[in-house]
Amino acid sequence: MPPLKYDYAYRLKRDFPDFEIIINGGIKTEAEIDEHLRHLDGVMLGREAYHNPFVMATFDQRYYGDDSASKSREQILEVMIPYIQAQLAQHGAKGLKLNSITRHMLGLMTGLPGARAFRQVLSDSKKLAAGDANLLLEAAARLRTAA
């Protein structure tokens, strides 16, 4: 991948101030977002949002003034269990590959003690094949025992 040249985007915005310029690539922290927003109209998080989705937990409040409380990681797991159960009921364990849901949750606990064990449970092919939504409870228990 070629090196990212943010200054090129900044120069474009200076040269064409009426154009909406939004940047994407290599952005991982709120400090980096804030720096880019000093120069540009928007920022997109790509890989970081996927690998560490909880990084966005405060974005609505911080960037849009939405004071409604964001969900905790535990609350997210709590709502995912009935969602998975509903998907299993609709498609059956054979028709739904559980990892089509859980793979998008692998980074949810990034940075917490036990995050690796959490990912291991959600990636275990035998457990996934069983098609049991309680897999999330087992993964969460690994976090608690690591803390």
Where do the protein language model's features map onto the residues?
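Alpha/beta catalytic cores of nucleotide-metabolism and tRNA/nucleoside-modifying enzymes
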Residues: 3-23, 27-147
